[in-house]
């Protein structure tokens, strides 16, 4: 994937707001040392997070999905 676009990400996320939230959480995880879910690159953490979302490597979980 040469360039990641918002439209690529929105195919896997229900809204732009959810996309921003997911990307921000993933950037935090990456900065704390989480493993990459895509091929390593020299991109910034935000771009890596968006690429992972566009590649459908990250999924949005609903609060109602939690058991307990």
From Swiss-Prot:
Signal peptide residues on this chain, from the entry's feature table: none
Pfam families found in the cross-reference section: RNA_pol_Rpb6 (PF01192)
Keyword field contains Transport: no
One GO cellular component term noted in the UniProt record for this chain: DNA-directed RNA polymerase complex
SMART domains given in the database record: RNA_pol_Rpb6 (SM01409)
Keyword list, A-Z: DNA-directed RNA polymerase, Nucleotidyltransferase, Transcription, Transferase
GO MF annotation terms: DNA binding; DNA-directed RNA polymerase activity
Reaction equation(s) it catalyzes: RNA(n) + a ribonucleoside 5'-triphosphate = RNA(n+1) + diphosphate
EC number: 2.7.7.6
GO biological process, any: DNA-templated transcription
Subunit structure: The RNAP catalytic core consists of 2 alpha, 1 beta, 1 beta' and 1 omega subunit. When a sigma factor is associated with the core the holoenzyme is formed, which can initiate transcription.
PANTHER family: DNA-DIRECTED RNA POLYMERASE SUBUNIT OMEGA
Function: Promotes RNA polymerase assembly. Latches the N- and C-terminal regions of the beta' subunit thereby facilitating its interaction with the beta and alpha subunits.
Family according to the record: Belongs to the RNA polymerase subunit omega family.
HAMAP family the UniProt entry points to: RNApol_bact_RpoZ (MF_00366)
Protein's name according to its UniProt entry: DNA-directed RNA polymerase subunit omega
Gene behind the chain: rpoZ
């Amino acid at each position: 994937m040469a360039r990641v676009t918002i439209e690529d990400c929105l195919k896997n996320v229900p809204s732009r707001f959810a996309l921003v939230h997911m990307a921000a959480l993933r950037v935090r995880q990456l900065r704390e040392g989480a493993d990459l879910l895509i091929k390593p690159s020299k991109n910034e953490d935000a771009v890596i997070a968006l690429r992972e979302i566009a590649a459908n490597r990250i999924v949005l979980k609903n609060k109602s999905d939690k058991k307990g």
